[in-house]
Structure formats: structure tokens, C-alpha cells
């Protein structure tokens, strides 16, 4: 079995780690960074940029630069959270034919898993460059509070990126693995508070060690899949926009370029205010009107930022209470608090969490890397590289079906350890009913339509009988990824119907296969583009060095030779403006051939100085050819 890499596919940043011998190693990407911005850009010339290169050009290409895609994955367009994001994002969120939230880039509709796959491909390539081998398997993390549709969509993204997703694990659980594996912690109960770029989770986890085997058992989990650093940024952006409007009478919300600059500045200011008491947001030439250019210069204090976001931080505390209650624990029974996610660097967040638990959170876990490290550990467990670790995760939400009167009847309660299987017998509501519809739901509300609909299917061919007589056994089976399989069986006839729940939304197999093919085609296009760039660089270098030599010794060349070199230079220069690699390489070869005369002209010429011929000839024996470098006098 090859390496199974661990990927933290984050809202704001992503990270990849591997088991390297006995150690877990977080890998640096091609830019030399250990985390990669989860930003994807589609340029005018058809190139796809991922990470820092995408982030750098965001200001000039806001409509085609996509970020925070994780907030849309597995969601419906009409969802309240999606509608809220749709009003503030510079890119276009649209409804797919099946009602999912998709994105529109350059007049083309794209699914969130298809876009997230570009980030996963970069993570895959980072690991392949480090290991020198092809990677096909991964463990990918998701927020603990992700529902079935969001988990399925994440697996789809992995497939599109060319990865077999061996396991989906919850981010707080992964962080607990990273924390607990390399420490002699003994038996402990910990709380993992995970506030990332777009999602929030809290998990209560018990770590037990028996005869050298560590068991990580999740007792309870809770959270909010639409609360994170992006929301903190948006509070700051709205404040800056409102202040600018007060001063200048101009609403920047109508200017996508200005909003993109403002987003970057707001995020930077938020980060600075974690260590400083105040900062200046200074954006010259933010916009212009008939009276001339407008400049934005606003001073923001830490106290001001905290007043803007305090309600968001408080929102994260309610799930803490519910998780503790579900685990049957009091605050005093939590021995360690682990902070995960970049937003937990904010002093206000740290203070509120410390006040809630009555103890300071641990500072020895890297909030940006812990989740990827835990994913790599789980990959090591699956491949056999890591021994004596058992992970017992839970289903975050109750699962059930709609029964008579529009009631949700739960078959599997929230915080049930997975994998798990549960069956229950139901019956018909009408006399001689020949079919039943099994409507699968996820959530905690009593009314069926208040919960998340995961899909429905029919069991027909039920033998005619008075209502309440037929016995229909419904079985829910959750696998280790937290993905649900449902079957319904008529116990009288033995007739059975099974489905793996693909939410009524989601990508179908044909769409996934098409996206996989597109991704493979893109990989080939990327390779060709890289080769074209290499040829261009080689051509540019040759142009520069040949011109330099021509300046130095061109006067020693015959007129015909000089003309031939000039023509070859022009031909190469013209080829470099095109997209044809073969043409560029041919013109490089042509220039190399004709510029041989330049090389000859730059060598010492015996017999060229008339009277000094004999002396030159005698000295020639002692001459050693050497490379030289022109040193220009400093002025």
C-alpha cells in the first residue's frame, strides 16, 4: 500500500501532512509555505491559479477569484446562509439545475466540489513532489458538524482531484489525534474548540491508554457550519465601508475592485490587532468620482474590533454548553482545552474560551497544522504505519425518517459512535397501501420539514393488507466516513430497496466522471503550459546573452554573419510571443547555430596582429581558456 496523505481542506487555508518514518511531517508547497490559501483563480488566458498566486491577483480579477468555497459545498442555493454570502461575495453564486449552490465563472457554471478539487490537486502535487511518487489515497478532514450532503460533496472533490478518499474524519478529532499521539497524557478528557475560516466545531473527546493502545473516543460534538473568520472579516469590512460612506458619501459596495482591496486590508488589520492595540487601514485611490480620487484612511482599535465581533464569539459559546450536556460532563471535568483554527489567535476568543472552561487553553498545538497532522496519523492507522491507535468518532446529528403526521422519527441519535447500524419496523398508514416513501432526514427538530432532507426513495410491491399490518423494516447504516446507507424491507414479501444517501442535491455519477475527465485534461494542459514557460525562459535567456555578445564583439563579424544573427534574433523574439513550444525550440536551435560565429569572434585570434604573430603563437601554448565575468565599475 502506498502513502495515504492527510489533507486539511480549510475554508481559508489548506494543509497537507504525511507520515515520514516515525514522524508526522507538514509539507511545504511550491511557494515554500506550510499552508496554502484555499483560493482559486481563473485567468483571462485560461490558466487556473491556486493558493498565493491566486491571492496575489485577486484585486484585479475579483469576479473570477473564488474563496471560502467550503461554505457552499453540499448546500442548496436557497439556504439562508448561501443567500447571505451571495450578497457580499465579489463572485457570482448561482442555482444549479438541481437547486444546489454553484458558482459562475466566465459564463460557465461550476460545482463547489469541482473548485475545491483544484486545492486538493495542489495538496496532492505538494506531497508527490516531496515523496517523488504518485499519490492516489488521502484522508480528508471536514467540520464535525458537516451533514451528509457536505461529506459526500467533499468525497466527490477528492475523486475529481484524482484521490481515493480512504476516510473522512472530523477536524476536532484530527486535532485531538495530533495533540494526544506524541504526549504522555494518560487518561484525559479534552475539549477541542475549532474556529476556522468558515466553520466552528466543539468536540468533547476522551483519551484512554490501555496496554500501550490509545483510544480517542468522541463523547459529543456540536457546532455551526457557517461561523468563522470570514464572518469576522465581514464585520470589519462593513464597518470600514460605513465609515468611508460617512466621510465621503460614497458606498464602496458597488465597486468590486474596491471591495476586494478592502477585504485584504480588513483581514490584515484583524490579524494585526491580535498583537497590536490599534492599526491604520490605509488604502489610497480606493475609488474616484467627478471630484477626483478618494482615499480611505481609518484608524481601528482592538476594542473597536472586539465590539464588532463579540456577538460572533458569544455565538460559539452556546454549542459548548450543548456538547458538555450531551457528554454528561461539567466544565470542571475537562482537563485540557485545545484551540484549533486561525481565528483562535484572536485574544477575545482565547479570553472567552478560558472564562467558559475556567482554565487557560493549551498553547502547544499549532492551530493551523494540527488538523492536517491528525489526518496524516489516521492515514497511517489505515495503512498500518501507525499502530496502537483506535479512533471512535460520532455522528454529529440525529438521523431518521418522516412518519405519519409529518413527524421526524430518529433511528440514530446524535453523538452515536460510528460506524453503526440500527433497524426499526414501521407500517402502512392506509388500507391496502402498495408502496411507501422513505423520506430520510437529518437534524434535531420534531417537525420533519424543519430538518435537512437527505433524500427519499420508494418501496413498492407491498402486499395488500389493512393499515398497520405490513411490517416494513427500515435499516440505517453509517460507515466510518459518517455517510449513510439506508434500506427498507417488506418482511412479508422479502422485497427490499437500498440506497446510499446522496442528498436530493449533490453531483450524480455522470457529473463526477465528467469532472474527473476535465481535471485529467487540465493536468495535461498544465504540463504543456509548464513546458512552454520553460522554453520561453530558455529563449529569453538566449536572446539576452546573444545580444550582449553582439554588443561586445559584433564589430569583428563579417556583415553576412551579423545579418544572419540579427534575423535569428528577430525570429526567436517573434516566436516567444506565440504559444507554440516546438516553434520556440526550433528558433532557439537556429540562433544557437548561427551565433557560433560570435563564440569564435570572442576567442583570441592567432596571427591577427601582424608583427606580433610569432610572439602570439609562442604565448598560445601557455593560454588557458577561462570563463570570465564582466565587472562593471560602481559609480
UniProtKB/Swiss-Prot annotation:
InterPro entries: ATPase_NBD, Chaperone_DnaK, Heat_shock_70_CS, HSP70_C_sf, HSP70_peptide-bd_sf, Hsp_70_fam. Keywords: ATP-binding, Chaperone, Nucleotide-binding, Phosphoprotein, Stress response. The keyword Chaperone applies. Induction: By stress conditions e.g. heat shock. It holds the Pfam family HSP70. One of its GO terms (molecular function) is ATP binding. The modification Phosphothreonine is found at residue 199. It comes from the Bacteria. Residues 600-635 are annotated as: Disordered. SUPFAM superfamilies: Actin-like ATPase domain (SSF53067), Heat shock protein 70kD (HSP70), C-terminal subdomain (SSF100934), Heat shock protein 70kD (HSP70), peptide-binding domain (SSF100920). The keyword Kinase does not apply. NCBIfam families: PRK00290.1, PRK05183.1, prok_dnaK. HAMAP family: DnaK. Acts as a chaperone. Belongs to the heat shock protein 70 family. This is Chaperone protein DnaK. It comes from Pectobacterium atrosepticum (strain SCRI 1043 / ATCC BAA-672) (Erwinia carotovora subsp. atroseptica). The gene is dnaK.
Amino acid at each position: 500500500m502506498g502513502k495515504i496523505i492527510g489533507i486539511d481542506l480549510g475554508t481559508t487555508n489548506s494543509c497537507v501532512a504525511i507520515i515520514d518514518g516515525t514522524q508526522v511531517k507538514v509539507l511545504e508547497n511550491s511557494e515554500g509555505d506550510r499552508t496554502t490559501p484555499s483560493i482559486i483563480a481563473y485567468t483571462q488566458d485560461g490558466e487556473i491559479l491556486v493558493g498565493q498566486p491566486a491571492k496575489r491577483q485577486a484585486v484585479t480579477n475579483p469576479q473570477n477569484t473564488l474563496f471560502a468555497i467550503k461554505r457552499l459545498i453540499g448546500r442548496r442555493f436557497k439556504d439562508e446562509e448561501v443567500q447571505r454570502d451571495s450578497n457580499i461575495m465579489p463572485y457570482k453564486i448561482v442555482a444549479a439545475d438541481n437547486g444546489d449552490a454553484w458558482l459562475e465563472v466566465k459564463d460557465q457554471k461550476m460545482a463547489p466540489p469541482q473548485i475545491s478539487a483544484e486545492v486538493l490537486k495542489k495538496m496532492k502535487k505538494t506531497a508527490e513532489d516531496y515523496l517523488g511518487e504518485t499519490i492516489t489515497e488521502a484522508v480528508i478532514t471536514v467540520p464535525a458538524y458537516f451533514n451528509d450532503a457536505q461529506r459526500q460533496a467533499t468525497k466527490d472533490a477528492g475523486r475529481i482531484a484524482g484521490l481515493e478518499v480512504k476516510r473522512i474524519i472530523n477536524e476536532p478529532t484530527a486535532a485531538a489525534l495530533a495533540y494526544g499521539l506524541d504526549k504522555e497524557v494518560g487518561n484525559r478528557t479534552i475539549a477541542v474548540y475549532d474556529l476556522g475560516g468558515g466553520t466552528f466545531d466543539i468536540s468533547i473527546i476522551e483519551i484512554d491508554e490501555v496496554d500501550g493502545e490509545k483510544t480517542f473516543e468522541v463523547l459529543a460534538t456540536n457546532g455551526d457550519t457557517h461561523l468563522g473568520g470570514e464572518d469576522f472579516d465581514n464585520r470589519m469590512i462593513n464597518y470600514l465601508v460605513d465609515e468611508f460612506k460617512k466621510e465621503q458619501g460614497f458606498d464602496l459596495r458597488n465597486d468590486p475592485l474596491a471591495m476586494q482591496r478592502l477585504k485584504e486590508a480588513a483581514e490584515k488589520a484583524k490579524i494585526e490587532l491580535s498583537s497590536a492595540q490599534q492599526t491604520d487601514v490605509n488604502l489610497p485611490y480606493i475609488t474616484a468620482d467627478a471630484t477626483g480620487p478618494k482615499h480611505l484612511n481609518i484608524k481601528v482599535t482592538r476594542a473597536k474590533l472586539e465590539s464588532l465581533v463579540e456577538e460572533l464569539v458569544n455565538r460559539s459559546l452556546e454549542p459548548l454548553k450543548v456538547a458538555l450536556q450531551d457528554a454528561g460532563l461539567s466544565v470542571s471535568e475537562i482537563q485540557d482545552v485545545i484551540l484549533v483554527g486561525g481565528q483562535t489567535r484572536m485574544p477575545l476568543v482565547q479570553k472567552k474560551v478560558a472564562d467558559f472552561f475556567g482554565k487557560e487553553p493549551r498553547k502547544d498545538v499549532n492551530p493551523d497544522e494540527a488538523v492536517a497532522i491528525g489526518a496524516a496519523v489516521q492515514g497511517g492507522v489505515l495503512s498500518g504505519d501507525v499502530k496502537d491507535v483506535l479512533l471512535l468518532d460520532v455522528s454529529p446529528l440525529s438521523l431518521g425518517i418522516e412518519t405519519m403526521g409529518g413527524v421526524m422519527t430518529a433511528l440514530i441519535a446524535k453523538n452515536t459512535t460510528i460506524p453503526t447500524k440500527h433497524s426499526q419496523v414501521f407500517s402502512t398508514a392506509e388500507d391496502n397501501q402498495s408502496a411507501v416513501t422513505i423520506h430520510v432526514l437529518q437534524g434535531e427538530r420534531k417537525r420533519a420539514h424543519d430538518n435537512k432532507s437527505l433524500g427519499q426513495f420508494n418501496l413498492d410491491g407491498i402486499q395488500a393488507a389493512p393499515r398497520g399490518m405490513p411490517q416494513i423494516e427500515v435499516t440505517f447504516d453509517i460507515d466510518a466516513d459518517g455517510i449513510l446507507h439506508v434500506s427498507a424491507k417488506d418482511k412479508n414479501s422479502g422485497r427490499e430497496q437500498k440506497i446510499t444517501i446522496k442528498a436530493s442535491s449533490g453531483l450524480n455519477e455522470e457529473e463526477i466522471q465528467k469532472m474527473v475527465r476535465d481535471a485529467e485534461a487540465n493536468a495535461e494542459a498544465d504540463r504543456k503550459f509548464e513546458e512552454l514557460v520553460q522554453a520561453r525562459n530558455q529563449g529569453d535567456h538566449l536572446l539576452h546573452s546573444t545580444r550582449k555578445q553582439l554588443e561586445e564583439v559584433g564589430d569583428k563579424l563579417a556583415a553576412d554573419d551579423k545579418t544572419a544573427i540579427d534575423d535569428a534574433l528577430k525570429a526567436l523574439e517573434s516566436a516567444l510571443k506565440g504559444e507554440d513550444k516546438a516553434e520556440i525550440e526550433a528558433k532557439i536551435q537556429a540562433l544557437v547555430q548561427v551565433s557560433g560565429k560570435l563564440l569564435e569572434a570572442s576567442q583570441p585570434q592567432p596571427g591577427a596582429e601582424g608583427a606580433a604573430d610569432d610572439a602570439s603563437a609562442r604565448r598560445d601554448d601557455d593560454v588557458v581558456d577561462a570563463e570570465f565575468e564582466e565587472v562593471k565599475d560602481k559609480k
